[in-house]
């Protein structure tokens, strides 16, 4: 970090969002937990965090899914944890993404899409993420990235403004990092001054700067120089570094 940083006095702040306290909707074919207010779940304390607006932890039954529907002016990312998801959109894309795959769609001026579980037997477990773009009216775009072979014990930059280091390019000053950890793995992530982090545990268990978190838990962190993560069981974590 820059030498001048050492002269700044930081008052660390961490706000924990426990998984069991999230909004919950069980529609039979869809079992969904909402980190932030979404659809019929509304909590004024949890309307989003910085540009991060939605993290939905969804399980979709075999053969079921979200039919063709519209979006505009939103950055939409989907990460598949188990199973598979079939994507179709009005841009002409038709893909099946599987466990370990990330999908990005810039809704921009407007796009229609559907997301369906193509399996006749297996539920699909996924995270759907919405980030508010820094400008409206961009051209719709689709991209995907496979992380199935990603090295464990490392944070991988998977999305960023401008698409740094081969990551998917999004329309916001937000970096999304993905980590796959084995028990005992330790990771550190420097957090620049005036930036804040949202850490979401997708699977497993870990300790973040002294706080124990398990699957579905999350934490908002600011005013720290370094985020320290230690896996206490095999885990997957998403780290959002936000302006």
List PLM regions with ranges:
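Jelly-roll (double-stranded beta-helix
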Residues: 2-243
